Regions:
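Terminal substrate-recognition subdomain of acyl/acetyltransferases
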Residues: 2-54, 63-64, 85, 146-254
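A conserved beta-strand-loop-helix scaffold within acyl/acetyltransferase catalytic domains
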Residues: 57-122
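Eukaryotic short linear interaction motifs
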Residues: 99-102, 109-115, 125-131, 159-163, ...
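Conserved acetyl-CoA-binding loop-helix of GNAT-fold acetyltransferases
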Residues: 124, 130-143
Length: 254
């Protein structure tokens, strides 16, 4: 089941614990330390031309998202991965480039309201979840795009949103929050350059999009279940109980 389980790694805090986000060293290649896994950074176009990285991203995705409502497994083939990486700015891989355990790719999207750093896809192999891998990946992306005044992504999983809010300081928009006019216009303006938003209905008032992405395994870990007593975020229940065909939008303005 787990194609990459032989890779050693270093444990980071669980994002549901009441602890600060881990800090990583700067640079394009973070070596492994006791605080987390090694995170390598590649430009999207360079990664798209690297057969090993394309296979790695496809393999991690295919092991991570379970099944469609019709019972067929979610798959991201080599051709689709190549196309997605060609059109993005950064690929981050947790572990090494031959036997990684997680990835994130994303890009900065310009608009007349300023740039936004958008996480286009992130996945961590099931065996390695709740070990800080996603936190390390989002941290690396946030450092690489720190000049952008906003971070955004679409997700069906409240844990992903929690990770981002613990890493990025700033004003958060998620759930029924009545975002300002400028933010609504930004979403409309970037939608053709954003894979998540292209062709989707955007409910700006509730910060959701209706997509065809509804993996049945998404309910594996969506309940608020911290290891230490800590208050549940006000938006958590809204994201936890979204219908399967919807994803939440999160934007953080720094």
């Amino acid at each position: 089941m787990d194609l990459f389980s032989s890779l050693p790694f270093y444990v980071q805090p669980d994002p549901l614990q009441n602890s600060p986000a881990p800090q990583q060293s700067s640079g394009t290649d973070d070596t492994a330390s006791q605080s987390g896994p090694a995170i390598s950074c590649h430009s999207g176009p360079a990664a798209a031309s690297n057969d090993q990285l394309v296979k790695l991203v496809s393999g991690i995705f295919n092991e991570s998202f379970g099944f469609r409502p019709d019972g067929k497994p979610y798959r991201l083939g080599l051709k689709s991965v190549t196309e997605r990486l060609t059109a993005t700015d950064y690929l981050f891989v947790a572990g090494d480039d031959h036997s990684g355990i997680g990835y994130l790719f994303g890009k900065e999207i310009p608009s007349s309201y300023g740039r936004i750093a958008w996480v286009e896809s992130m996945a961590v192999l099931p065996l390695y979840r709740r070990r800080g891998i996603a936190t390390a990946l989002v941290s690396a992306f946030a450092r690489a795009t720190k000049a952008a005044p906003r971070l955004g992504f679409a997700t069906p999983n409240p844990i992903a949103a929690l990770i981002a809010t613990r890493i990025m300081p700033g004003k958060m928009y998620i759930g029924p929050c009545s975002p300002p006019y400028a933010l609504r216009r930004l979403l409309k303006e970037i939608r053709q350059d954003c894979f998540d938003l292209r062709g989707c209905h955007i409910d700006e008032g509730n910060m959701t999009i209706k997509t065809g992405f509804s993996p049945l395994s998404r309910s594996d870990q969506r309940e608020w279940n911290p290891r230490r007593p800590v208050a549940e975020p006000s938006w958590w229940k809204f994201v936890e109980h979204l219908p399967n065909e919807f994803e939440a939008l999160l934007i953080i303005e720094t």
